[in-house]
């Protein structure tokens, strides 16, 4: 039997890779530091560039996929997005004509089916041996792999161990995300009529960007997320904390509420969501807009020396606002599985060359996009 490929990280990239390999009869084992509890209960935009090739390995049609993962499937919806919503194509990398809003937790649950996932495994060490790379985890578990895939996100332990000089860059933007639950009858009466049939709506107030998104609908309630973001203002901006710890993300400064109050009257549904008294009861997180990148020579070096390759945010993170990181990770996984399945001696090296070009294009596109998102409306003339 073929030795299973160890995949570190069971997020979208790792899970998609596992399913794509399974589709080809290639075994894998996913090691994830988190637990099996449902997580990431928020909405993402899926572009057809990513989900169309995913349908084949899942043996689903697009309508069935939407019925499984769309944010509003419980109420008969298909994750629709208004044409008024600007979707970033990143200079043609993504086809946005038939994009829809999916609940990430639902998508991950779907992708987990049939996979061998080892939960609560935090990577401790990677050692090169005659049998390949040996992975050691904090719980004393270990495994060997002739190829190891780092798919463990922007805070990648694999990257920290093998490429410690590469750290995420923090872009000069302030961003906060909040979650709220609204009674279904209230949402249907007071929110939905002003959202133009879309599961995500956006507005500008000078250089500030405001977004409201449906995460999921149930019979009794609707889960909603909001985003408030803007460029950093000077060196003493109280809302910009680029050096905060991960644990400090839920420490929300009072200045946020003061700034939102100062925006004045907003149109519905923004007036209901960005009500500072209601916001104080929301689960709010401070977001950092991160990017990562590695040179092609560094990646080839790790592939040749340690038989390790990277996908997704572990090696080319894009900012949450203006980025297409979820779609990029899915495409990484699908194309890497193709390269592995061909069993060519230079297959993964060639895959790196192809994808690195797309990663550079995506990073540049996401940075242009986040800049344009925060331009005052009168000066915003180019499309995202």
Which residues are covered by each model-predicted region?
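Active-site flanking residues adjacent to catalytic metal/cofactor-binding acidic residues
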Residues: 8, 31, 151, 311-313
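Glycine-rich FAD pyrophosphate-binding loop
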Residues: 22-42
């Amino acid at each position: 039997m073929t030795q299973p490929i160890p995949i570190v990280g069971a997020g979208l990239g790792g899970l998609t890779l596992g399913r794509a390999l399974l589709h080809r009869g290639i075994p894998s084992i996913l090691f994830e530091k988190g637990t099996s509890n449902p997580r990431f209960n928020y909405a993402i935009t899926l572009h057809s560039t990513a989900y169309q090739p995913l349908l084949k390995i899942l043996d689903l049609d697009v309508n069935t996929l939407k019925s499984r993962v769309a944010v509003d499937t419980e109420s008969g919806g298909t994750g629709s997005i208004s044409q008024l919503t600007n979707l970033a194509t990143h200079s043609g990398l993504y086809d946005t004509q038939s994009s829809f809003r999916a609940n990430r937790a639902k998508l991950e649950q779907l992708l987990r089916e049939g996979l061998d996932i080892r939960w609560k495994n935090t990577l401790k060490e990677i050692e090169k041996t005659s049998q390949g790379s040996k992975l050691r985890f904090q719980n004393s578990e270990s495994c060997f792999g002739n190829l190891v895939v780092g798919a463990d996100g922007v805070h990648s332990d694999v990257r920290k161990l093998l490429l410690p000089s590469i750290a995420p860059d923090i872009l000069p933007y302030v961003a906060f995300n909040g979650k709220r639950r609204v009674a279904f009858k209230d949402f249907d009466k007071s929110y939905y009529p002003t959202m133009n049939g879309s599961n995500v709506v956006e507005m500008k107030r000078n250089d500030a960007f405001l977004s409201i998104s449906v995460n999921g609908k149930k019979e009794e309630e609707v889960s909603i997320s909001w985003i408030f973001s803007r460029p950093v203002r000077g060196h003493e901006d109280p809302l910009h904390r680029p050096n905060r710890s991960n644990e400090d993300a839920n420490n929300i400064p009072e200045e946020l509420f003061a700034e939102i109050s100062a925006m004045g009257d907003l149109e519905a549904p923004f007036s209901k969501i960005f009500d500072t008294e209601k916001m104080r009861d929301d689960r709010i997180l401070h977001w950092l807009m991160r990017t990562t990148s590695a040179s092609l020579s560094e990646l080839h070096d790790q592939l040749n020396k340690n038989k390790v390759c990277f996908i997704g945010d572990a090696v080319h993170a894009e900012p949450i606002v203006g980025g297409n990181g979820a779609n990029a990770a899915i495409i990484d996984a699908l194309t890497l599985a193709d390269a592995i399945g061909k069993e060519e001696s230079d297959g993964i090296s060639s895959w790196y060359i192809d994808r690195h070009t797309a990663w550079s294009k995506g990073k540049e596109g996401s940075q242009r996009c986040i800049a344009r998102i925060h331009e005052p409306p009168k000066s915003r003339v180019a499309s995202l």
